[in-house]
Amino acid sequence: MQATDSKNKVVYWGTGRRKSAVAAVRLVPGTGAITVNGRDGETHFNRIPTYIQTIKAPLETLGLENEYDIIVKAEGGGLTGQADAVKLGVARALCQLAPENRPPLKSEGYLTRDPRAKERKKYGLHKARKAPQYSKR
């Protein structure tokens, strides 16, 4: 959704989920800075460049990587899940920014929610599928 913040800047919203991570993403016109939970994106993701590249991928597809600041509130999951949740939120916010952004993002797969999640543990098994050792006698 489009809204305005306290400084009358236009803000675009998007929500992303991956595994057990949820990310509420705001896109604000700026210089390309990433802020996650009030901290610098590099600090939050332990300076691992893969996560930063993942987050910026939808912006790079459209050539907007230095035109919008990304402000994120991320909860749950680990760093990989949060990074992928932010990527989905950024892509959804870019679709609200301009409807013509949708086809290139969809063709790259940035608007698809990854449905893979941890399988539940079953009784009688050690983990979701790991069975106790079988003994014939």
Swiss-Prot record:
Keywords: Ribonucleoprotein, Ribosomal protein
Similarity-based family: Belongs to the universal ribosomal protein uS9 family.
Entry GO CC: cytosolic small ribosomal subunit
Molecular function terms, GO-annotated: RNA binding; structural constituent of ribosome
NCBIfam families linked to this entry: PRK00132.1 (NF001099)
Presence of keyword Ribonucleoprotein: yes
Listed transmembrane segments: none
SUPFAM superfamilies named among the record's database cross-references: Ribosomal protein S5 domain 2-like
Region (Disordered) location: 100-137
Protein name, entry field: Small ribosomal subunit protein uS9
Single GO biological process annotation from the record: translation
Organism: Microcystis aeruginosa (strain NIES-843 / IAM M-2473)
Bias kind Basic residues: ranges: 118-137
InterPro entries named among the record's database cross-references: Ribosomal_Su5_D2-typ_SF, Ribosomal_uS9, Ribosomal_uS9_bac/plastid, Ribosomal_uS9_CS, Ribsml_uS5_D2-typ_fold_subgr
